[in-house]
Amino acid sequence: MSNSQTLVVKLGTSVLTGGSRRLNRAHIVELVRQCAQQHAAGHRIVIVTSGAIAAGREHLGYPELPATIASKQLLAAVGQSRLIQLWEQLFSIYGIHVGQMLLTRADMEDRERFLNARDTLTALLDNRIVPVINENDAVATAEIKVGDNDNLSALAAILAGADKLLLLTDQQGLFTADPRNNPQAELIQDVYGIDDTLRAIAGDSVSGLGTGGMGTKLQAADVAGRAGIETVIAAGSKPGVINDVIEGLPVGTRFHPQQTPLENRKRWIFGAPPAGEITVDEGAQSAILERGSSLLPKGIKSVTGNFSRGEVIRIRNLEGRDIAHGVSRYNSDALRRIAGHHSQQIDAILGYEYGPVAVHRDDMITQ
């Protein structure tokens, strides 16, 4: 559908448990129903789920939250499989498949792993599969301590090229003060820029099961906003909250991005110093400039410099004129080996492949 949106929905532990010590399955069923409804309407849904530790505790019958990181990781290891089984079971009611992705911050900071994660996420969405993302809590350390699922959801939104990020919590949104102890607190409905004043009034969650608070949600909104993604913080218990966000209705606190994702990407590609350059033939030049096509290895005449997969490179024509900048899907050595060859030969030449193109049109800005 032409107006299809990509929505990342992050569900905190407080939302999944309803403030109790157990997963609130009835509540999760309702959220899945809304996601399935939007999925059927042609929208692309990504789930970022907390709750592995809570699910592990419930399954093992632990009476209290352990104080050590190792104990939390034990619970996460047990609970993660229970959690994905629940998501799989509920989405299957609507004939929807899910795909699990376990990530850590390191996956986002390493260029190669970032691109691989993006490729996987894109493949899932393109095949109408709902990605279910969580931190790999069983091996992560700092992430568990800081409640990074909020920030992880922002990074997932960037990976997915999302239009909107919805952070569901146990509060209606961001207030001028903590509404739990200040009856004069008012809901902030629209935010056009995050400053120190806003950060100062962001309170923290009191959930004994989760690790995120309003402060980390503000960080996530800031990260997403810099990438041109709108963020909404809203109560997971609000009826129809996912539908409202898709339809753009007033709900919770809406963080308006300062620029569109395309503008942000253009700025990044143009702003990044090229790590190398490639020269292309006339056919490739015409395909790029006149038809807006991706660059195929067949059209590459030469490769200059040493660069890694995921770095920005300069694309020049045979006369030496810059025609585009783009993100290379292969490193310089690999490009030299596949230059001039058909895409079908990539795997035979390299022993692997990251797709048929050298630079994808979505990762390319023409001069």
From Swiss-Prot:
Q: Which organism is it from?
A: Cronobacter sakazakii (strain ATCC BAA-894) (Enterobacter sakazakii)
Q: What's the main place this protein lives?
A: cytoplasm
Range of residues in the leader sequence: none
A Pfam match: AA_kinase
* Sites where the protein binds substrate: S50, D137, N149
User: What is the protein's name according to its record?
Assistant: Glutamate 5-kinase
EC number(s) per entry: 2.7.2.11
According to the UniProt record, which cysteines are disulfide-bonded?
A: none
Q: Which residues form the PUA domain?
A: 275-353
Similarity section:
Belongs to the glutamate 5-kinase family.
Taxonomic lineage of this organism?
A: Bacteria, Pseudomonadati, Pseudomonadota, Gammaproteobacteria, Enterobacterales
Coiled-coil region: none
Which pathway does it operate in?
Answer: Amino-acid biosynthesis; L-proline biosynthesis; L-glutamate 5-semialdehyde from L-glutamate: step 1/2
Q: Which domain of life is it from?
A: Bacteria
Gene that produces this protein: proB
Keyword terms, alphabetized: Amino-acid biosynthesis, ATP-binding, Cytoplasm, Kinase, Nucleotide-binding, Proline biosynthesis, Transferase
Task: Provide the reaction this enzyme catalyses.
Answer: L-glutamate + ATP = L-glutamyl 5-phosphate + ADP
Per its UniProt record, what InterPro entries does this chain match? AceGlu_kinase-like_sf (IPR036393), Asp/Glu/Uridylate_kinase (IPR001048), G5K_ProB (IPR041739), Glu/AcGlu_kinase (IPR001057), Glu_5kinase (IPR011529), Glu_5kinase/COase_Synthase (IPR005715), Glutamate_5-kinase_CS (IPR019797), PUA (IPR002478)
Q: Which GO terms describe its cellular component?
A: cytosol
Which locations, inside or outside the cell, does it occupy?
Cytoplasm
Function per UniProt: Catalyzes the transfer of a phosphate group to glutamate to form L-glutamate 5-phosphate.
| UniProt GO molecular function | ATP binding; glutamate 5-kinase activity; RNA binding
The residues listed in the UniProt record as binding ATP, with positions renumbered to this chain, are K10, T169, D170, T211, G212, G213, M214, G215, T216, K217
Q: Which GO terms describe its biological process?
A: L-proline biosynthetic process
Q: Which SMART domains is this protein grouped with?
A: PUA
